[in-house]
Amino acid sequence: MKELINSIGKKKLIMIFGGIVGVVVLIIICLLLYNAFFVSNTYSSVESKIVQAAMEYYGKHQNLLPKSPNDEVSVNSTTLTSSGYLGDLQEMVPDEGVSCAATVTVTNVNNNYRYVANLKCGDKYQTETFVNHVKSVERTVVTGQGLYDMNGELVYRGENPNNYVKFADRLWRIVKFENDSAMLILDDKYARSVWDDRFNTERNRNDGINDYSVSRANDALTNLYNGEDLFSASDKLLIVAHDLAIGKRGETIQYNDGSVEKSQVLEDKYIGLLPLYDYINVSLDENCSSASTQSCSNYNYLNLLESSWWLLTGDSDTTHRVYRIDSSGIIGLTRASTNSYLRPVIYLAKDAIYVGGDGTFENPYLVK
């Protein structure tokens, strides 16, 4: 080897090695430039261009926008192209010879507008909603942690299922899918607050009143949603109004299908707290059946805080007590005027689009 190096010469060897490195670097640069200029249109970027075209279209045709909250309208790619707002889809997508079509749905969200493109390109690509993606990778189970079919809802149960979502720059857990809308709870405590501290005539003191519709907790969460501390304007476009199940419940009641809590609802709220029955259903402990069962803290991914936090549900046997989860994950009743943490609960739009992730803590789901 030494003789070979001497025969070639060290300088020539360095030049040869340098030339090889240079060629490799040149190839890499060429590939990057090719990707930048010729394969820049990923399907996701095409969806973004379709949405931009729809925004320009409705900017010129504002009379066609949905008038009332939750109303929807749609426009297809053929209309956008023929009107001059969008180029030929077949020339925009990364795969040649693929026939594509798209529809943009516009939803009135609290008098703002959410635009969602649904792009289909043969068997090469199909826009995937978040709920459809989860259903395709998370088969429902009947034992162990995971996604369960319960009372017509898809409910995550167990100690640590893959139900993490990164949204509004924070981690959330998917509690369940209800009518294809994901119910999320913040995976941390947010703000310490009384549930309510109004004067209670039965108690003759400020122990609070356990009616969520007129509670301090409702006021605090409504202000939180309306502000910008937790959600940006674009975040709010993905949050949909939902009827909160605020029915009161006794400690020993064992109906966990939501019928008790849903006996009274607070309509069209964008943010709330977790109803008692949802906490009970998350636990896999076979003895967990009511609020009086301490074992509901077992095998329960919602039992993760070292502080107490409020539930949405009031006590049906009193006018001042409310359910909360203590620092050990045990369900208990306490005065509404006590301080505990709020864990906001929201619902994502059923047409929220899956962007990435596998639901683990290290790689949470991403949506748009």
Residue map of PLM features:
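Extracellular/periplasmic head regions of type IV pilus-like filament subunits
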Residues: 66-103, 221
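Collagenous Gly-X-Y triple-helix signature in extracellular proteins
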Residues: 125-368
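Structured segments of extracytoplasmic/periplasmic soluble domains
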Residues: 53-60, 83-84, 177, 347
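Substrate-binding/catalytic groove segments of enzymes
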Residues: 60-65, 84-91, 319-322, 351-355
